[in-house]
From Swiss-Prot:
Keywords, alphabetical: ATP-binding, Chaperone, Cytoplasm, Isomerase, Nucleotide-binding
Family from the record: Belongs to the chaperonin (HSP60) family.
PROSITE patterns: CHAPERONINS_CPN60 (PS00296)
Protein name, as recorded: Chaperonin GroEL
Main location: cytoplasm
EC number: 5.6.1.7
Alphabetical list of CDD domains matching this protein: GroEL
InterPro entries membership: Chaperonin_Cpn60_CS, Cpn60/GroEL, Cpn60/GroEL/TCP-1, GroEL-like_apical_dom_sf, GROEL-like_equatorial_sf, TCP-1-like_intermed_sf
Family matches, as NCBIfam families: GroEL, PRK00013.1, PRK12849.1, PRK12850.1, PRK12851.1
Known catalytic reactions: ATP + H2O + a folded polypeptide = ADP + phosphate + an unfolded polypeptide
Keyword Isomerase: yes
Amino acid sequence: MAAKDVKFGNDARIKMLRGVNILADAVKVTLGPKGRNVVLDKSFGSPTITKDGVSVAREIELEDKFENMGAQMVKEVASKANDAAGDGTTTATVLAQSIITEGLKAVAAGMNPMDLKRGIDKAVIAAVEELKKLSVPCSDSKAIAQVGTISANSDSTVGELIAQAMEKVGKEGVITVEEGSGLQDELDVVEGMQFDRGYLSPYFINKPETGSIELESPFILLADKKISNIREMLPVLEAVAKAGKPLLIIAEDVEGEALATLVVNTMRGIVKVAAVKAPGFGDRRKAMLQDIATLTAGTVISEEIGLELEKTTLEDLGQAKRVVINKDTTIIIDGVGDEAAIQGRVAQIRQQIEDATSDYDKEKLQERVAKLAGGVAVIKVGAATEVEMKEKKARVEDALHATRAAVEEGVVAGGGVALIRAAHAIAGLKGDNEDQNVGIKVALRAMESPLRQIVVNAGEEASVIANKVKAGEGSFGYNAYTEEYGDMIAMGILDPTKVTRSALQYAASIAGLMITTECMVTDLPRDDKGADMGAGGMGGMGGMGGMM
């Protein structure tokens, strides 16, 4: 086991604070509408230019191991805020730096670290309650666009795109961000249920100009089995032919004689059929077939529950207004499923999302909710160069997370104003003893730091503006972009409540741990020079290298 380097008390805290400051100073230059860029060197390819706090934090690794521990703990603040709300990483870092700096000063002055931490925690709990009171719902497109714009560093086109996407696919819909091929940002919306399975035979194509199959008001047969024997299918095919409607078959697979017969029937015009494989694999396929059944008011024909293909009637088939199939995807538009049944299914999947442990499962379940609830929107980001593309894509993703958070918990006045109002509302809070009171003051002072940093980055005098904002009330604040005072909500400067709340909670959590640190342990750097020159197996002669 390697020898350890151990530092105690003030020595440890000074080193840790130095690491905190290096990381926080690098991150906080990006805060606000006039925040600066940070250039990150990459071991291959061109450097990355970013204004995203968490991207900067992730790149920082310090040589001094004690300093690095401080930096890594603050990096954790940014990561946690990012995971919880997808934004607010820079705000969280600025808050953490302020609480740690002020807290360690108090520890150096002889305060009890545990009481300081209790005071900080008390203040944060009270401030979070105040933020909830200040929060207003974010329901209309205008507010959503404003939140997106602020999070994308005042890029209004991004805010508008996100608002349009949310309008099209609903608040629950899946919105993905991809790299586009042109200079302009684009929005593609896929309405209805789409899954990644195309036609099983090109002979089903009835729209040769687009290479796709379009079925109007089709019946939909859902089978959780391979279909290879056409005899099983005959009763259904005859019933569908009599009804004079097309048929879409979604099954584990359709092969051999069954597929050949379906193709021949389609080409002769006896019955219009298309067949696709069911989406997903294993249990996920069963669940997705059930989703489609709910959406189209059909029944999944599965031998597990005693249903056989030969006995299938038109009542067992689902229906939709339209189905479009190409070689890779199938889209079911306007299924006739009962709205209450669809909502019930969505609620059931939501419960599974809460119980899911892996991110992959959560993502897949979220996709299923979106497909049932509305549709999928794809924002294609346009840019002139690859470097700009990466930077912009990261900003759009941030903005998307922020708007989701805003829809979830509402919005508060942006520009650091909400924290100042929350701090003012709890200014009379008292702890159990004097040290806790100091902890409360540390937290209250830290809540001013985001506003101060936004102002500093805009090249203005922080104290003057902070005092003027503190003297105001409600959503009165300072717009660093236009350099004027006014009602932040009216000016469209909004922050999602969830983002502000998460930033404060995670910053206080990690800062509290760091203030109460008394000892730090790390590996001593290994000095291999002397050992290498020693005589291998001769126990006490390891130092012979020095005699040369």
